[in-house]
Amino acid sequence: MELMSSLGSLLASSLPIEKKQHALVELVLHTYQPQQRTALFKTVTEYRRNQLELLFPEHQAKSDSVMFEVMDYRDLIQRYPNTLSTEVALLEEAVGQCYIHWLDFWCECEISAIKAKLPLSTHALYPMDLPIKDSAYYGVIIDQIENSQLIVQTPTRPQGLPISDAIALSNLEVFIKGEKWYEMLPLLHLSQTGKHFILLKHPTDEAFPTLVSSALIQDWSKYETWLSYAPPFCNDKWKYSLSRRGYEGLAELHIFTPPALSKCDSIPEFDNKFQLQLAEMQAVCEILRLTVSGNIQQKVYFLYLAQKEMLNLLHQAGYKIGFTIIDQPLILDFYKAIEPQAYLPLGYCDLNETNLLTYRGLWNIELMLKAFNHVNFRDYRRCLRENKNTAWQII
């Protein structure tokens, strides 16, 4: 009843939109416990997604970012009021006043929930020095991030955060809010658990190391939940592209029984044969959610250094193959320029029919590491600067 009253007052108020947004987020965070909040967001997301698929069946295979923007959210909730409960219907009405759609609101709530654990003090707002200097940084792979006692700061949050919260916040700000990868919201726990690579700046005058890059590493023991094997990334819409030399490169790794994969005609067929013939399970992983922080030039540098550091650590740990999903062709062009056989392209697909391709492929970790060890950041930057596929202003 208190929530209903507060929502009614908020809807009737003439507060500026920014203050309304803040008040609505605070109301939800104070009303629902974390598990209740997650259940609420998942339930309404599924309810509206199913509804939108019925209304626009031609878009039902597309991403959440596309589905939730095919119809104005305020029009949607007015024409099709929520039938889950009166409380949820009123909440959606308030969300419609303040946010683009439900998933945009969910993202903001999760960001605020993490930031609320340690409010940002005014004296902490100072420019952070992130030098373009390899020796200023170091990489680490942490097996169970949820059990780590490591405290870090981030370029946008110069106060100590548990590493699991720092990674989740980075994923929220970079991928979900920045790239609109809303499918990550119900899987946010993956940012706070399991195996992760992190790139840290050595503390100088700061109290904590600074997190500038992270990536999720999933071992073969979890392959059933890999993104690579999720339906949108493993179907016949994908154009299969593994070359004859790619098959030879896989055979040379000696991870299959029998040692060579027979030629495949599709991504699903390749995935099936790979799973059936894989004998050296500990040599294979999936690498996802590679985030980098900073301004454009810093991001370019951290993308280079994070890959180099991570490859070194993966190789030391005995990994031979890393599954990847990449949506930036400039990265693939760089791989091809430094060592054509280090990256094995499996296929590509225009997932949302927007003329933007997503690529599935494999890192040959040993070859990729050797290639990175023979280039420096100047080479990397020159390659990107000359690349017609990049929208980044590389100087």
Curated annotation (Swiss-Prot):
Name the UniProt key words of this record, in alphabetical order. Answer: Autoinducer synthesis, Quorum sensing, S-adenosyl-L-methionine, Transferase
Q: Give a Pfam family name.
A: AHL_synthase
Catalytic activity reads: a fatty acyl-[ACP] + S-adenosyl-L-methionine = an N-acyl-L-homoserine lactone + S-methyl-5'-thioadenosine + holo-[ACP] + H(+)
This enzyme's EC code(s): 2.3.1.184
GO molecular function terms attached to this record: N-acyl homoserine lactone synthase activity
Query: Which InterPro entries does its entry note?
Result: AHL_synthase (IPR035304)
The reply on keyword S-adenosyl-L-methionine is: yes
List, in alphabetical order, the GO biological process terms annotated in this UniProt record: quorum sensing
At the top of the EC hierarchy, this enzyme's class is: transferase
Disulphide bridges: none
Family of the protein in this entry: Belongs to the LuxM / VanM family.
Could you identify this protein by its name?
Answer: Acyl-homoserine-lactone synthase LuxM
